[in-house]
A protein has these predicted regions:
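Generic structural signal for buried aliphatic residues
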Residues: 1-2, 7, 98, 243, ...
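A generic local secondary-structure boundary/capping motif
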Residues: 3-4, 19-25, 88-89, 127, ...
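Short, glycine/charged-enriched hinge/interface segments at domain edges or termini
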Residues: 1-73, 213, 218
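A general structural motif
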Residues: 52-57, 78-84, 127-137
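Short glycine-rich anion-binding loops that position phosphate/pyrophosphate groups of nucleotides
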Residues: 38-39, 103-106, 154
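Residue-level signal for inorganic ion chemistry
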Residues: 33, 64, 99, 203, ...
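Flexible glycine/proline-rich
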Residues: 115-254
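N-terminal small/polar loop signature for handling phosphorylated ligands or for N-terminal nucleophile
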Residues: 61-119
Length: 254
């Protein structure tokens, strides 16, 4: 078994057949998920005017577990600076990675960057990525606690995309896990890029006479249904004008 191999039933059986009782493994990161917003209500509640169900806590928690990381805590927090800072400070003490969805933009209630920078003693090194969706992303590191800090967009599809593109990728790099090879497919339509931004385009795959076709899944980054409908994504380079119908592209799976 090579370094970076995830131990599943077949791998465990192979080790047993060889009489190997113990093997060195990577300790999973401990992760805390915090979703911020006064508008968030529990998923078993009926949202009132100006309210939405708390999607990100559940979706991100599921993705954390799928990645093989240890979910320590997950909860929604109101847009109250003192309360949010208290929750983040508690999480930093116990976790290797903190994910905060929402509050990463530039509005009056968007206080995540300021709090993270204060807690980590100027540890925030990025506020804003040339990525669509995902522009308001915050990245930081607490040197004292050795904790990664991630401020994700509040929109569900954008939050999941940023987690996948940055933190799942980083975990695989640290542990030596090989990337899943992309699929080759042909675009079903012309699509313009976003000048100055790398675009993460959600697509669904369908079989055609000439091979796999990639059909864009259109929808706003706040619609989690777009992520559920997609089979993967195509990356459009920031210097690329766009994609043409029939153009061959690489489709990466989640």
């Amino acid at each position: 078994l090579k370094a970076g191999t995830r131990i599943g039933p077949a791998q465990a059986g192979t080790l047993a057949a060889l009489g190997v009782v113990q093997v060195p493994v990577f300790k999973p990161w401990k992760v805390a998920v915090l979703s911020t917003g006064d508008e968030l209500v529990r998923i078993d509640q009926v949202p009132g005017p100006g309210q939405v169900r708390d999607i990100n806590t559940w979706a991100l928690s599921c993705y954390v577990k799928k990645t093989g990381l240890e979910l320590v805590s997950a909860e929604a927090v109101k847009d109250e600076e003192v309360l949010l800072e208290e929750k983040i400070r508690e999480a930093v003490k116990a976790c290797d990675l903190i994910l905060i969805s929402g509050g990463s933009s530039q509005g009056k209630k968007d206080m995540t960057m300021e709090i993270l920078n204060r807690i980590s003693k100027e540890g925030v090194f990025t506020h804003g990525l040339a990525l669509k969706p995902g522009k308001p992303t915050i990245l930081g590191y607490d040197k004292e606690k050795h904790t990664l800090l991630g401020g994700l967009p509040g929109h569900p599809a954008a939050a999941l995309a940023v987690f996948h593109l940055l933190f799942v990728w980083l975990w695989k790099q640290v542990t030596g896990q090989p990337d899943q090879p992309p699929l080759e497919a042909f675009m079903t339509t012309n699509l313009a890029g976003a000048p100055g931004k790398t675009t993460c385009l959600l697509v669904k795959l369908q079989m055609a006479p000439q091979g796999l076709e990639a059909e864009p899944v259109f929808g706003k980054s706040g619609l989690i249904s777009t992520m559920a409908e997609a089979d993967g994504y195509v990356l459009i380079d920031m210097n690329q004008e766009g994609l043409k119908k029939g153009e061959q592209v690489k489709v990466y799976r989640f």
